[in-house]
Amino acid sequence: MKYRDLREFIALLEQRGELKRIQQSIDPYLEMTEIADRTLRVGGPALLFENPKGYDIPVLCNLFGTPQRVALGMGQEEVGALRDVGKLLAFLKEPDPPKGFRDLVEKLPQFKQILNMPTKRLSKAPCQEQVLQGDDVDLATLPVMHCWPQDVAPLVSWGLTVTRGPCKSRQNLGIYRQQVLGKNKLIMRWLSHRGGALDFQDWCQAHPGERFPVAVALGADPATLLAAVTPVPDSLSEYAFAGLLRGHKSEVVKCLSCDLEVPASAEIVLEGYIEPGETAPEGPYGDHTGYYNEVERFPVFTVTHLTQRDRPIYHSTYTGRPPDEPAVLGLALNEVFVPLLQKQFPEIVDFYLPPEGCSYRMAVVTMKKQYPGHAKRVMMGVWSFLRQFMYTKFVIVCDDDINARDWQDVIWALTTRMDPARDTLLIENTPIDYLDFASPVSGLGSKMGLDATNKWPGETQREWGHPIVMDEAVRARVDTLWNELDIFANDKDAQ
């Protein structure tokens, strides 16, 4: 699916019946959340609120409200094709040199995709068609959603934040929520291990007391947004990866106030700085956990310039108890993670992050077990391989005869193949999401690994059970009789 910017993507969704325009006046205060939530829970379309109450800028919600739309945003027609995106990422993370001519021919598509990686800088860009600066900047003109009754203030939710560390050539793109604090101020909620926060820490060490340049793009194209939430290798720019997804180079433009580059086709861009030491209490907000989070201090982002397209569109979302849009994104990105893990751990058959577990707090892994203790090695591998799994509290490991995505299968394995004392691994004092109020200390808690695999000699002294399986000849015989038996005839008559 080819598109160049958010507007082209919206048009393509509309052609497919995947976008609904809403003409009624809908309030960004709570009403949009309720409508978007009801729509997402039944797999409904993206929503374009054309007449937000009190504003003249349309609001786009539920853009990634189904895994299929996430796949389309990544340039794929089917969710299953996201495995190919994962294979490409695995290749970029650790490229294997061709082993011969035939292997070179097979790898040519990957090498051709890499040609789309460099960015293209434009001298003029749609995102700078209108320019406001200084006292003319007023965030109150944007229809920023106030999502839940006890939220402290309106919240920018899809802000693509662009930063660069003092010793880095590549820019970092990240999605961080931002509380509206005033006319030209937001609170930048980035966790300490995220790219933007690390760039800021490095800047403060290299340039103590100096302002840290930041830009935030609202309404960037889907490929760039999705690249920002995908585990791209540290050596690869998210802009470059977005070019791979999109099939053509990412077009960027230099900010008016600094050297950072922003997506040329973004609907709205906020430029400004963070003053070292300037922080403010952020929250509470209803979060993806289904609870209001605690209040914590984060840096303040001061906006000096607001640039935008003519007749801009404001892109927004809400977070709440799954399913919400982050949970849907997690479900789709799950397919990207599988090939990455399999390249490092070929014994892994499948990997599943249940959306009910906030899409990262629990993982189910199926594997081809090869030796005693193998399941524990896989647990450790999951926790340590990607930063995205640093906050995963529970890892369940099963054999490959179990369907990782079927709870009936997983629970059967847990209850028949596990001894709680022998097969439970507990690790204390590990990094935990500070939003996880179940941990005894903010940001620090425990992890649990559950070995639900069949036990090998050395792991048990008992004779292990043999699964019940019907004789194949009998199964074949019943297959030939099945239609003739017409066992469900009464059900058909009732219909």
UniProtKB/Swiss-Prot annotation:
GO molecular function, one term: metal ion binding
Keyword Chaperone: no
Primary site of residence: membrane
Catalytic center residues: 287 (proton donor)
InterPro entries, per database record: UbiD, UbiD-like_C, UbiD-like_N, UbiD_bacteria, UbiD_Rift_dom
One Gene Ontology cellular component: cytosol
Domain of life of the source: Bacteria
Membrane topology listed for this record: Peripheral membrane protein
List of residues binding Mn(2+): 172, 238
EC identifiers of the protein: 4.1.1.98
Cofactor requirements of the protein: prenylated FMN; Mn(2+)
Cofactor: how bound: Binds 1 prenylated FMN per subunit.
Annotated family: Belongs to the UbiD family.
NCBIfam families associated with the record: PRK10922.1 (NF008175), UbiD family decarboxylase (TIGR00148)
Protein name, entry field: 3-octaprenyl-4-hydroxybenzoate carboxy-lyase
Name of the gene this protein is made from: ubiD
